[in-house]
From Swiss-Prot:
Name this polypeptide is given: Cytochrome b
Cofactor note (record): Binds 2 heme b groups non-covalently.
Cofactors: heme b
GO process terms (BP): mitochondrial electron transport, ubiquinol to cytochrome c
Lineage per the UniProt record: Eukaryota, Metazoa, Chordata, Craniata, Vertebrata
Protein source organism: Varecia rubra (Red ruffed lemur)
PANTHER family reported in the protein's UniProt record: CYTOCHROME B (PTHR19271:SF16)
Domain of life: Eukaryota
GO (cellular component) term, any one: mitochondrial inner membrane
Amino acid sequence: MTNTRKNHPLMKIMNNSLIDLPAPSNISSWWNFGSLLGACLTLQVITGLFLAMHYTADTTTAFSSITHICRDVNYGWIIRYLHANGASMFFLCLFIHIGRGLYYGSFTLLETWNIGIILLFTVMATAFMGYVLPWGQMSFWGATVITNLLSAIPYIGINLVEWIWGGFSVDKATLTRFFAFHFILPFIIMALVMVHLLFLHETGSNNPLGIPSNSDKIPFHPYYTIKDFLGLLLLILLTVTLVLFSPDLLTDPDNYMPANPLNTPPHIKPEWYFLFAYAILRSIPNKLGGVLALFFSILILAIIPLLHTAKQQSMIFRPLSQYLFWILIANLFILTWIGGQPVEHPYTIIGQTASILYFSLILIIMPLVNLIENKMLKW
């Protein structure tokens, strides 16, 4: 069996990626989230496939087909809620995964980091289009508001929006194409994940100390397979608890009303995982400025390697940077809270302050503090 595992053309790839992969001996549980994201993606593809068997991408029957799935299909309700809450778990793991990359300086592995950013944009696009499919009030108005943002692009904006809509408003054509894209994108995500892992295995994983670990490697199996399995059990526990006890905790009640183009909901807001970006978008009074801020709030991750002025890769020995990192995390929590609040005083000013702080921390304050720490360490 050992010879087959190491010599068979297909099994050799699996073996070098999952079994005999040399891994640093000191990576902590923060490194579990890569495998958890793989588990989330698998869950989403499987549940999504079963949902697609019963879903109809038509404005007149989409909402009814979701009701049919929940009421008439065998265990349809659990498949639907696993898919909806699985997306929340996906983004939770995604944010922690990115946060770990920032804290421990994994962004210095440039190819892996950049593919990760492309993956983030693709997953966000997939989740947005998935949110439109139930064709409830928030689905319809969310699609209208977010696609309308493209009209801020000078000269081609209006034509671009109508081209995406397939008409003069969000309608049947929009729903059909969103379903088509929502179905195909997870497979593109899978391909990108393979590229992400390919680049990661070119350099090897980073570790909490941020120092080369070539002199002290251990095989991935059994050490990290067992460790990842524990993380997986905890994720399953959290997801199943959410699905069975409070499946609608993270959804919007407005989405249980069929889409009505003549009636606007009082507060249009996306799912919780987009609220931080939505708060940044709303904090700028100018439409084009808001769209650019929204886009750069995520694209800013791409320039973080250029802003890394510290001599040490990891933050583990840099207390000032750690302090700023946790301020950034707290700031993101504030932005998430503000994104779900109505546009009125004092939420507006809090959102604007948090947005300015978000960009200031990443672009100005953290690089300067890195330089100060270099001086303190006489580097």
